[in-house]
Amino acid sequence: MATVEDSQFQQGYPIQPAKAEARQVSQPTGVILREIVETLLLTLFIFWIVNTATGRYRVQGHSMMPTLKEGEYLIINKLSYYLEEPKRGDIIVLHYPRDRSREYIKRIVGLPGDRIEIGNGQVKVNGTGLTEPYLNGAPTYHEQSWVVPEDSYFVLGDNRNNSSDSRNWSFLPRSDIVGKASVIYWGVEDWGLVPHYPHLTGQSPVTG
């Protein structure tokens, strides 16, 4: 006995179910392509956000010993100082003011308006001697003093006897701050949050 499809074929009518089946085959391909494109765009967007908000920095030299060692890799928070003001004790990555293509890493010691005095093996800010437990040995200083201008900072390396810093090239403009050092992600034995000392007044270090 002939089926309905047999009758349609014999009478020359097109068989509609076949077209519907073809459409069903093509639709999954379009969906897959769209999902691939959406995934690529989302990946690029996330990559852009991450690179805008953070940076990577490799410690070169010994100016931040013993806090940071040569060859360690850090994650830098580039947005930190859009949300808060830089503080004494913060470790930052900066553009070297005499050659902005080079980046240094130092610790903020003086804020705008601070009077910095160095002598007799100690740093004083506004007349108060700083407690600096992170220093690499006893520093030797030539007696000097400065007043930090507006929108500028006074930065020093933790390894005072082996550091090119504000004692040599003066104040750091705020516009030359790249970001706040946040995480040591390599080498493995030192992995963790970068220690910051708020106000440098003998308080315990704050990480992050």
Question: Which residues does each PLM region occupy?
Answer:
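PP2C/PPM family metal-dependent serine/threonine protein phosphatase catalytic domain
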Residues: 125-141
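PRPP/pyrophosphate-binding module of the type I phosphoribosyltransferase fold
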Residues: 154
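Short, surface-exposed secondary-structure edge patches
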Residues: 63-67, 82-85, 107, 145, ...
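Mid-length scaffold segments of soluble, non-membrane domains
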Residues: 103-107, 111-128
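Protein maturation boundaries and topogenic segments
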Residues: 1-103, 174-176, 180-208
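Phosphate/adenylate-binding glycine loop and adjacent helical scaffold
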Residues: 157
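Active-site loop architecture of trypsin-fold serine endopeptidases
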Residues: 161-168
